Amino acid sequence: MFKLLKIENARMNVPEPVFHEATTAEAISIGEALVLTNGKLTKCAATATPQFIAIGQVGASDANRKVAVCRVESNQVYEVPVTAAPTSLKVGDKVTIHTDGLQVTATTTSGVITIENLNGASAAGDTIVVRI
């Protein structure tokens, strides 16, 4: 999951929550990368730039579809797991988002998430520091 690590040059390290409706029959998890499509939140595609990170959750069959999210801003830095061993990755590489919207891949072709720090990551599931 995308976990906010810090907001650079901000007096408070807490993003302002906003609420949007989730796409019908789609579950959303805390820390998931999201975009608005047709006015509703949906999982971010691998090579799309996330607009929001979920700070609330909703089940696929929940009647209340409103989800708390924070807007993605350029001064935010996140920790996120990588789905494959990041052995060939370097700081500054751009990687894609995994299909679950909660992790990044080690794929740099058409990447949208910039690596800020590898944090000593050497295996799948290890956490790296990124900027969106």
Predicted feature residues:
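Surface-exposed, low-hydrophobicity beta-strand/loop segments enriched in small/polar/acidic residues
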Residues: 1-132
